[in-house]
Amino acid sequence: MKKVFLILILFLSCYIIYNNTLDNKMYYLTIGDFLSKGTNEYGISSYGYSDFIKDYLYKTKKLKEYNKTFTDNDYRISDIVRILEYNESKNNETLNRLIKKADIITISLGMNDLYYKLDNNQKIYTYIDNMLLDYDKILNYINKFHHNEVFILGYYNTSGQDNDIFEYANYNLKKTCDKYKFTYINLSDIFNNNPKYFSKSNNFTPNIKGYEKISQIIVEKIKNN
């Protein structure tokens, strides 16, 4: 009888340890445009900031699962709004379900929207206001569920012009992030007019050093959480 009891205690102890280890691991979801997809300056899907974050979580034995299904070079904010509203699926997964599962979320959206509008920047501040109202819909949905961390990437300007437009967009994006207590990642201080992180001129896609720099900023915040 004692032997059976000891075996039962041992089994329960192992089960509790296993469960605690599993509970400490995190489901990492990244959403968004070319930055979250990890597209390099040559237009090829390569190693992005989210892949470096995934590597950190894996090496520190904190990674449960990593998902970048809902990333695409051409995604705009309105695309993600539509995907959520209509519960659209991709590769047999829905973003709605993935958001509910995620412990850590990183999002990069709006760069495509901004650079598209720069060629015709009439009423651009109204355009940005409407763009961020749509972004708010996404963040409001995410906020309904518990997450350890949500990181939102800000905007940067590689053109050397229209800085006031990017400052306005970043200021209001940060206000939206603060509203939900999500972490805003300031990229403009690092990337604006910094050729170190861009291998091709007239191209706002960072090189591998740029992606690694983004990941370092986010990883540092994860460590300090």
Where are these regions (language model features)?
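Conserved SGNH/GDSL esterase-like catalytic core that processes O-acyl groups on lipids
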Residues: 37-125, 130
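Structural recognition of the beta-strand scaffold that forms the well-ordered cores
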Residues: 28-31, 36, 67-71, 103-108, ...
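N-terminal secretory targeting modules
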Residues: 1-31, 35-44, 54-66, 96-98, ...
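Extracytoplasmic/secreted proteins, especially bacterial periplasmic and envelope-associated proteins
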Residues: 48, 52, 79, 97, ...
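Catalytic His-Asp segment of secreted/periplasmic serine-dependent ester chemistry enzymes
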Residues: 155-225
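A short, flexible beta-alpha/helix-coil linker loop
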Residues: 35-37, 112-114, 157-159, 198
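Active-site segments of SGNH/GDSL-like serine hydrolases
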Residues: 108-112, 139-168
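Sec-exported extracytoplasmic/periplasmic mature domains
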Residues: 54, 58-59, 85, 110, ...
